């Protein structure tokens, strides 16, 4: 079986990022990621809008309280996906067809195995985590029901994320966008039908989510099986190659551990939030949904720099990889500044999309106005961490982020809860952690750079 890398931009959608204008390459790659993630967040947000307006405040709090648990498991898998994407981008940049084919098939085989594990883990551990967060008794039954349904079908999300990650690693961020649009539209329609027409409540939102995720998984796997390049998925070639698996885990495990443990630490943060009651919980949920929208441009640029650095280092172009990192940081900071002002100005209007409860609205607006000015710090976190991962160094970002987002934040919350115990002081644990992380990553990047001690 032979494949060719004869064109800079392949008819299949793959894009070599080793030549051409750097800013243009990053933006062209990041834009489909941004639009796709906007659609993904749109249907997640519609879940909350539908539940908050057509079910109850308690149901909104129930859905929001599950985010930490869901993100813990998905975060670990996303880290592994990052590891696979870095290896694939290096294979693609160096034009190593054989290694690329092997990595793709090892990646999908690993995904199938891990999907079973995460499904079982989610189903069995969810009740424990809900209790650990001190979820209020009036919220607990609906939270538990939502998680049970969600984790029963979470394999679809994992297969889509890994399949889309393969396409993005070879520079194709367009077709994952189309799939996400289909997924978002499907999810929104099913939300409205299940909740408003059939009155299924929180269960209806959960079913809508897993059905749309499985549609996405089927579509992305179908695309990969129809490819003609080295990353074509051939089911009979699925196997777990030991050397490739170790390369993926060397990069992906630290990233996954950092994402999972950071998300898990949010379980404890959520317990501090829960202490202030269901109205505060619902307000925190509305802020969390808007927060994810605001972070999308920054995260999209961060993801683009991982692929950019990976491909250019695979091609042996260190200087271009460094220039790409600097350019990405400038783009991210500029975007954050542009977004900040309208969100702060229209905070009450944006929050009112989720609920008309005055107490919940007040909490939501307070959180938005408190946190938004600190988003520039997140730009440094996202760009430097993703650039280092693209270079095959995911251990340093893991240590720095876990130290900032977990150790520092938990110490801060423990102390502040004893001294002040106000919702403002609790919420400030997030931006203070962002600032510490950005300072440490800035220092590390400028002292060590993109040099990886081990060959990918």
What are these regions, as identified by a protein language model?
Residues 19, 23-42, 46, 69-76, ...:
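Residue-level signal for short hydrophobic patches within transmembrane helices
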Residues 28-47, 149, 160, 183, ...:
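Transmembrane helical elements of multi-pass membrane transporters/channels
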Residues 38, 42-60, 130-137, 193-200, ...:
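Helix-terminus/linker motif at the lipid-water interface of multi-pass membrane proteins
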Residues 60-120, 157-176, 270, 283-347, ...:
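Small-residue-rich hydrophobic transmembrane alpha-helices
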């Amino acid at each position: 079986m032979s494949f060719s890398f004869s064109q800079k931009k392949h008819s299949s959608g793959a894009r070599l990022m080793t030549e051409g204008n750097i800013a243009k390459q990053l933006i062209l790659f990041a834009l489909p990621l941004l639009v796709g993630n906007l659609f993904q967040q749109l249907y997640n947000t519609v879940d909350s809008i539908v539940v908050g307006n057509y079910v109850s405040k308690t149901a909104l709090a129930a859905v929001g309280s599950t985010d930490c648990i869901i993100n813990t498991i998905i975060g670990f898998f996303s880290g592994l996906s990052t590891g696979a994407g870095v290896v694939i981008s290096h294979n693609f940049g160096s034009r190593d067809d054989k290694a690329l084919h092997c990595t793709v098939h090892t990646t999908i085989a690993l995904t199938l195995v891990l999907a079973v594990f995460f499904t079982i883990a989610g189903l069995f551990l969810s009740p424990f985590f809900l209790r650990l967060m001190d979820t209020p008794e009036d919220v607990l039954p609906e939270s538990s029901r939502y998680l049970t349904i969600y984790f029963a079908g979470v394999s679809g999300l994992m297969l889509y994320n890994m399949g889309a990650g393969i396409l993005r690693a070879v520079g194709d961020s367009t077709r994952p966008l189309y799939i996400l649009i289909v997924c978002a539209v499907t999810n929104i329609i099913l939300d409205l039908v299940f909740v408003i027409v059939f009155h299924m409540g929180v269960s209806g939102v959960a079913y809508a989510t897993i059905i749309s995720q499985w549609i996405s998984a089927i579509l992305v796997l179908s695309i990969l099986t129809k490819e003609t390049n080295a990353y074509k998925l051939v089911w009979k070639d699925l196997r777990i190659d030991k050397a490739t698996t170790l390369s993926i885990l060397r990069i992906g495990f630290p990233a996954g551990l950092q994402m999972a443990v950071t998300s898990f630490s949010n379980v404890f943060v959520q317990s501090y939030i829960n202490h202030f009651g269901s109205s505060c919980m619902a307000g925190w949920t509305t802020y969390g949904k808007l927060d994810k929208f605001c972070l999308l441009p920054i995260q999209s640029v961060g993801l683009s720099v991982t692929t950019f650095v990976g491909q250019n280092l695979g091609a042996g172009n260190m200087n271009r990889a460094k220039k790409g990192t600097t350019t990405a940081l400038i783009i991210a900071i500029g975007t954050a500044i542009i977004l900040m002002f309208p969100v702060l100005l229209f905070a009450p209007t944006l929050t009112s999309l989720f609920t008309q409860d005055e107490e919940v609205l007040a909490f939501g607006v307070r959180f938005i106005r408190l946190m938004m000015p600190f988003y520039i710090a997140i730009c440094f976190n996202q760009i430097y961490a993703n650039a280092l991962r693209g270079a095959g160094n995911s251990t340093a970002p893991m240590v720095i982020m876990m130290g900032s987002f977990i150790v520092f934040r938990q110490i801060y919350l423990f102390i502040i809860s004893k001294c002040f115990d106000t919702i403002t002081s609790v919420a400030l644990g997030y931006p203070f952690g962002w600032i510490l992380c950005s300072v440490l990553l800035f220092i590390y990047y400028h002292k060590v750079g993109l040099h990886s001690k081990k060959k990918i």
